A protein has these predicted regions:
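N-terminal periplasmic "start-of-domain" segments of outer-membrane beta-barrel proteins
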Residues: 42-79, 110-113
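Short acidic/polar hinge/loop motifs at secondary-structure boundaries
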Residues: 119-145, 233
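C-terminal beta-signal and adjacent terminal beta-strands/loops
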Residues: 637-645, 669-723
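Gram-negative outer-membrane beta-barrel transporters
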Residues: 419-421, 521, 525-529, 548-645, ...
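N-terminal periplasmic accessory domains that precede
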Residues: 85-88, 103, 127-128, 142, ...
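Transmembrane beta-barrel wall of Gram-negative outer-membrane proteins
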Residues: 178-207, 218-259, 284-304, 353-354, ...
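Extracytoplasmic beta-strand/coil segments of soluble accessory domains associated
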Residues: 77-80, 86-121, 138
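Membrane-embedded beta-barrel scaffold of Gram-negative outer-membrane proteins
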Residues: 295-318, 453, 460, 497-549, ...
Length: 723
């Protein structure tokens, strides 16, 4: 029997009972009957459920920690179905909230892997748009810790969105949500079936005046309008009681104004103009992502297989101020277009060799073509009589740098789930990965997890994972740096080594205890040893991050969690202590000042996204009030503060921003009356109830761009009708 530690949200305070730590069921596979297509809705439900169980048995999370939110849990939180994925995941244990919609799991920068029904969807070009809409999911899970061998590449966490299954009733819903900062968010879903074919579609639109975090503490940002569109479609055809084919895909389009920070000081003269109001800048960025997956699944007795070809196209465009205002402040501007086209295939399988051994295996291949085109305007420079560098003319020069790269990722894994006893499971294996792009590297990565359940409700786990994380392909070639010598875009550092893959030793252990009356508590501890630690920073006007490496690094942390679910009440809470440090920047050195390189070359420093303490809590109560159900919800988020410049000006990232606590409140009335009231839901939410003014970033630190403040208090309301 397989017992797996799936740790959920801790101290669960207002998400429903399904947002909790769970234990993965044993990976036994049902023996199918005659291979023929089901001929009734009931047969479809049973077959789909069994195929889902078989798919989950292919990709279990043995020995890792998993935070799971069901559809009910996603709906029963402040914001409900209209909450974005970042806000949902920020409530998970050990997750740090950052600017630009980013989160850091266990103090790692990005390094998150997104999957739909277990199939990897390649990451989009780094920006701040949200590719996935939680409303498409029947459940959302975050997997962390020492991952089994089937999980490679991005390994700080795996976010898996599982779509609904079974025979879809014909119906759907339509809703509208809006409020402060001119928020308008209509959405709709449609689902149904015809014969053995099920379909589901979702669409949403979001407009508000807080597309990117406000660089000032004011209630409303200047020049911060966003328009975002998301579409998703899913079709599944059950071919027989042992096989099905599923096709799904989506589109995310985001248009963002870059918010302005008034009162900035001009430093250059453009065409005789040396003054410009920084509140009037007009910089914009658009992000487009399209993805699709076709998955064939076979579940026949002891053998389960899934093969899934996929594609993803992502594009980011940045447009500077058309009047050249940013040139007057910075001495240059960039108009950029970055694109990435990915085709690949993922195949996974499991075979139950004996009662004690389940063998899992798989391959992965991805081909990516990236293109970059950056047109820069800048001033030529000269020196004055005192030897100071000054602009030689107020007329700009132009240079376009275009590059392209085709790269590949290869992966293969094999592992064995060995049931040593009914209470003790040992999962061990290895994977081989190779990258052929800006860097040519490969690694064999052993993985091992031991899970022990000495008694009902008690689970211990300990694990080790060797990880290999290739850098993203949107890299800057060193040749571009030299082309800007003698201009206002000249870099102080004239060289940059290529970005390398990160290599990591990961150790993790923990225990989970299920107590009486629905209370579960757990603790998890980890330690990581890193070579070529990957980090990313914002080094230009565009809000696209660029990667670089520290030669060495390490991270450690401890997570405490608890949740309570009993009847109508669900509560959770988490607290985590952790940190990450790196030493000696060994790639993309042209992004940094010489004094930074000198200090970091001889000292460990905190990475800019390292936060000592994080915490979250929340809960919900379901009240049957005669009209249906009344569901008040609340949650809070605590951050100890991300890194900033050293107040003494000595240690990079040697300072820290002030800590903060924000709380959100919501209440929803779900009607269950006759006629139009059937399926009707209305809700009201308050974000940042105390109107806490807090900085996520202050604009200082290694690779940090402009200041960013958290959202001020906002009031929102919504209505949704299910049909």
């Amino acid at each position: 029997m397989r017992n797996v530690l799936l740790t959920g949200a801790a101290f669960a305070a207002l998400l429903p009972a399904c947002a909790q730590a769970q234990t993965v069921p044993p990976s036994a596979t049902d023996t199918p009957g005659t291979a023929q297509a089901p001929d009734s809705a009931g047969d479809i439900v049973v077959t789909a459920q069994r195929l889902d169980q078989a798919r989950n048995a292919i990709l279990p999370s043995l020995g890792a920690s998993e935070y799971i939110l069901s559809r009910e849990a996603l709906d029963n939180q402040p914001g409900g179905a209209d909450r974005n994925l970042t806000q949902v995941l920020a409530q998970a244990p050990g997750v740090t909230l950052d600017s630009y919609g980013a989160i850091h799991v266990r103090n790692e920068h990005a390094n998150l892997q997104y999957r739909l029904n277990g199939v990897i969807v390649p990451e989009s070009i780094s920006g701040f748009g949200q590719t996935f809409d939680p409303r498409i999911a029947d459940s959302v899970s975050l997997l962390t810790g020492t991952l089994p061998a089937q999980y490679g590449y991005r390994t700080s966490g795996v976010v898996n969105l599982t779509t609904r299954s079974g025979a879809f009733d014909n119906g759907g819903d339509v809703g509208f949500y809006g409020g402060s900062r001119t928020t308008i968010q209509p959405s709709a879903t449609l689902h149904g079936n015809t014969g053995n074919l099920n379909y589901f579609a979702s669409g949403s639109y979001l407009q508000n005046d807080l597309g990117v975090e406000n660089p000032t503490a004011s209630l409303n940002a200047i020049h911060d309008r966003t328009r975002q569109y998301r579409l998703f479609g899913y079709v599944s055809d059950i071919l027989s009681d042992t096989s099905r084919i599923t096709v799904f895909g989506g589109t995310a389009i985001g248009k963002f104004q870059i918010p302005n920070n008034p009162g900035q000081t001009e430093a250059f003269t453009l065409n005789g103009r040396s003054t410009f109001d920084s509140a009037q800048l007009d910089q914009n960025q658009t992000e487009n992502t399209h993805y699709g997956v076709a998955a064939y699944q076979y579940a026949g007795g002891d053998l389960n297989l899934q093969i899934a070809p996929f594609f993803r196209y992502s594009e980011t465009r940045y447009r500077p101020d058309p009047q050249g205002g940013d040139i007057i402040f910075n001495g240059f501007n960039d108009r950029s277009r970055l694109s990435s086209l990915v085709f690949g295939v993922q195949s996974d399988g499991s075979y139950k060799a004996t009662e004690a051994h389940t063998i899992r295996f798989g391959i992965f291949f991805q081909n990516e073509r990236t293109k970059s085109s950056v047109t820069s305007l800048f001033f030529p420079t000269t020196t004055d009589g005192d030897g100071n560098t000054i602009q030689a003319t107020d007329q700009t020069s132009s240079l376009t740098d275009a590059s392209r790269k085709v790269g590949q990722l290869y992966g293969v894994y094999l592992q064995d789930e060995w049931a040593l006893t009914p209470a003790l499971t040992f999962n061990f294996g290895a994977r081989f990965d190779a990258v052929r792009a800006y860097t040519n590297e490969q690694q064999i990565s052993p993985r091992a997890n031991l899970v022990w359940k000495p008694m009902s409700g008690t689970t211990f786990h300990i694990g080790y994972a060797r990880n290999f994380t290739p850098p993203p392909q949107e890299l800057v070639a060193t040749a571009t740096v030299m082309r800007f010598n003698g201009t206002t875009k000249e870099s102080a550092i004239k060289f940059g080594d290529p970005v390398r893959a990160e290599r990591e030793h990961y150790f993790d252990g923990g225990v989970q205890q299920e107590l009486a009356h629905g209370l579960t508590i757990g603790v998890d501890a980890y330690y990581k040893i890193k070579k070529n630690l990957l980090d990313e920073g914002q080094f230009g006007s565009s809000l696209v991050l660029s990667p670089f490496n520290y030669a060495k690094g390490y991270a450690w942390g401890v997570e405490l969690r608890a949740n309570y679910a009993n009847g109508p009440v669900a509560l959770y809470g988490n607290v985590a202590r952790g940190q990450e440090k790196g030493r000696d920047i060994v790639s993309a050195q042209y992004f940094f000042a010489q004094d930074e390189l000198d200090y970091i070359g001889n000292h460990y420093i905190y990475t800019d996204h390292s936060q000592f303490w994080t915490g979250s809590a929340g809960g919900s109560v379901t009240i049957h009030d005669g009209l249906g159900t009344l569901v008040p919800t609340a949650d809070l988020l605590y951050g100890n503060g991300l890194r900033a410049d050293d107040p003494a000006g000595i240690v990079p990232n040697g300072g820290k921003l002030p800590s903060y606590v924000t709380a959100n409140f919501g209440i929803a009335q779900n009607f269950d009356g006759p006629g139009f009231q059937k399926g009707l839901s209305i809700r009201f939410d308050i974000v940042n109830v105390g109107d806490r003014i807090y900085e996520i970033r202050d604009g200082s630190g290694v690779g940090v761009g402009a200041p960013q403040y958290g959202a001020r208090r906002g009031f929102f309301a919504g209505i949704r009708k299910t049909f």
